[in-house]
Amino acid sequence: MEEFKRYIELDRSWQHNFFYPLIFQEYIYGFAYDHGLNKSILLENAGDKKYSLLIVKRLINRMYQQTHLILSANHSNQNDFFGHKHKKNLYYQIISEGFAVIVEIPFSLLLISSPEAEENQIVKSHNLRSIHSIFPFFEDKFLHLNYVLEILIPYPIHLEILVQTLRYWVKDASSLHLLRFFLYEYRNWNSLITPQKSNSIFSKRNQRLFLFLYNFHVCEYESIFFFLCNQSSHLRSTSFGALLERNYFYGKLEYLVKVKTFTKDFCLILWLFKDPFLHYVRYRGKSILASKGTSLLMHKWKYYLLNFWQCHFSLWSQPRRIYINRLSKHSLDFMGFFSSVRLNSSVIRSQMVANSFLIDNRIKKFDTIVRIIPLVGSLAKAKFCNVLGHPISKSVWTDLLDSDIIDRFGRICRNLSHYYGGSSRKKSLYRIKYILLLSCARTLARKHKSTVRAFLKRLGSAFLEEFFTTEEEKVLSLILPRDSSISGGLYRGPFWYLDIICIHDLANDE
C-alpha cells in the first residue's frame, strides 16, 4: 500500500473518495497485474493467449475517446464501446481487476494510517494474518463456554444492496455507477459463495472484486454487532476500530431501534448482549458465536440475528441456517476440522496411612480431528485413489521424471501435514499420507512396467518413508521429547502453524 500512497498523493481527488479518474491510470492495472499473479486476466485468458499491458493502453485510449456509455444490459446491442463480442469479456475483466484495486484503496490506507493500527502494530504482526490463529483462541476460550451458534451468513439477493452499503465510503457517483455495471453484467455473483455449482466468469476471474464486496457486506452487519457488544460490556475493541466510521453506525443504530418490531427500548437490546463470555469468529461465509450463557440466551441471539438481517439489510434467512449446539455434545465443523470439547478422565490412587482411595479427575480438553471423508473424496476426485480410499496410480504423471513424480507427491503430502498439524489425533492424517505414498509407488511402478512390490523391494520402502517425513517432524524430533508410549515415536500433539493465510484446497469441500 505504500506504492499506492506514493502514486495517489499526486492526485488529491482520492482524499474525497473520488476514484473514477484512477480507472484511466495505467499504474492501477500494473498493481492489479502484480497482485493477481498467474490468475490475472492480464497474463492469460481462457484461450491461453498471452497479454501484456499494451492492451491496457489501447483500452484507456478507447475510454478517452468514448463520449458516452450506455450502462444497461438491455441495450447491449447498441453499445459499441467494447467493439466485437469476443473482446467484450476481456475488457470487462481488465477494468474489473483495476476497479477491484481502486475500491480497496480507502480501506487499506485507513488501516495503515490508523492510530490503533500503529499502537497495536496490527499490520506488522504476521501471526494475526494466519487463519490458524483461530484454533489456539478456541483452545483457550472454548473450555469455559457452554453453547455455540454456527451461522451461515446470508448473501444479498438484490445486487443493489451491495452498492448501497458501499456508498457510505465511496462518494464518487461515477464509480458506483460503474460498480452497478459490473454487477448487472454478471448477475450470478453468488456463484462465488458456491463455486462448485457454477462455471460463471465470477468464480474464475473476478474473485478479487467480489470477495471484497462480500467481505464489506459482512463487515457492515458485524460492525453494529461489535458496537452493541462494546456498549453493553463497556469494553474497548480494537479488532474493527481501524475499519469503521463510527458516525454512520450511530445513525444506523438509531434507525435500527425505530424499525424494530420486537423491541422499542434500546436498553433492552443492550441487555440482550450483556454476556462477558461472548466470543465471535468468522471465516468466509460461516461464523461462530460462542457463549457461556444458557440455551434461552442463544435462542434470543438466533432470532435477533434473523430479524436484524431482514430489517436492516433486506435479507431473508431461514432459521435452519443458524444451529444451536452444546459444546459438550456436538462437534464444530470449521475450516476442515471437527472441533469439540471432551472430558478426559484420569484416576489417581491416594494412600493415607492404612487407607487408600481413588480420585477421579475430569479435565476438559479441546479436541480437533481431521475430516477424513471429505479428504478421501478430494483425493479420489484428483485421481489419487478410488472413492473407497484405495490408492491408484496417477497415470497423467507417468511421463515425468522419477524425481518430479516423487517431488509432486511429496509436496502435496507436506502441505497436508502443514495444514493439519494442529490435529490432536494424527491417525486420519497418517491414513491420507499412506494413500499418497502408495499412489506414488503405483505411479512409479506403472511407469517402469513393474509391480509395486518389486519396485519397493528394489528401491526400499525406507526411501519413500524418509521422503514423506516432513521437515517439521525432523525439527520436532530434535527439540521435543519422544513419546515413550508409542514405541519411541515423535511428538503427536497438536502443532499449529501461524503462517497459513488461506484454507487448503483439499480442506475446502464446499
Curated annotation (Swiss-Prot):
Transmembrane residue ranges: none
Cysteine pairings via disulfide bonds: none
GO annotation, cellular component aspect: chloroplast
Keywords attached to this entry: Chloroplast, mRNA processing, Plastid, RNA-binding, tRNA processing
Compartment list: Plastid, Chloroplast
Protein's GO biological process: mRNA processing; RNA splicing; tRNA processing
GO MF terms held by the record: RNA binding
Known function: Usually encoded in the trnK tRNA gene intron. Probably assists in splicing its own and other chloroplast group II introns.
Family listed: Belongs to the intron maturase 2 family. MatK subfamily.
Protein name, per record: Maturase K
Organismal lineage: Eukaryota, Viridiplantae, Streptophyta, Embryophyta, Tracheophyta
Protein's gene: matK
